Curated annotation (Swiss-Prot):
Provenance organism: Halalkalibacterium halodurans (strain ATCC BAA-125 / DSM 18197 / FERM 7344 / JCM 9153 / C-125) (Bacillus halodurans)
Transmembrane segments: 3-23
Lineage of the organism: Bacteria, Bacillati, Bacillota, Bacilli, Bacillales
UniProt entry tagged with the keyword Transmembrane helix: yes
GO cellular component, as recorded: plasma membrane
UniProt topology in membrane: Single-pass membrane protein
HAMAP family: UPF0154
Keywords, comma-separated and alphabetical: Membrane, Transmembrane, Transmembrane helix
Protein name: UPF0154 protein BH2350
Keyword Transmembrane: yes
Entry's family note: Belongs to the UPF0154 family.
Pfam families in alphabetical order: UPF0154 (PF03672)
UniProt-annotated location(s): Membrane
């Protein structure tokens, strides 16, 4: 009888972890679809919209600064 309770508890934990993983994965995918990460092309367009001339050096500096900020 004791082993049956332990089996059900273990099975419940495994099923809970699996369901949690798929829910978290779906949530993250929908978040990334709504808010894609910024790439160099997006930065170039953003700078052009602000009236600045986007040089490759400036874009590289901004990308490094954003990556440094995200790693904090």
């Amino acid at each position: 009888m004791n082993w049956m309770i332990l089996l059900w508890i273990t099975l419940g934990i495994v099923i809970g972890i699996a369901i949690g993983f798929f829910i978290a994965r779906k949530t993250m995918m929908s978040y990334l679809k709504k808010n894609p990460p910024i790439n160099e092309q997006m930065l170039r367009v953003m700078l052009m919209q602000m009236g600045q001339n986007p040089s490759q050096k400036k874009i590289n500096q901004m990308m490094k600064a954003m990556q440094k900020q995200q790693s904090k």
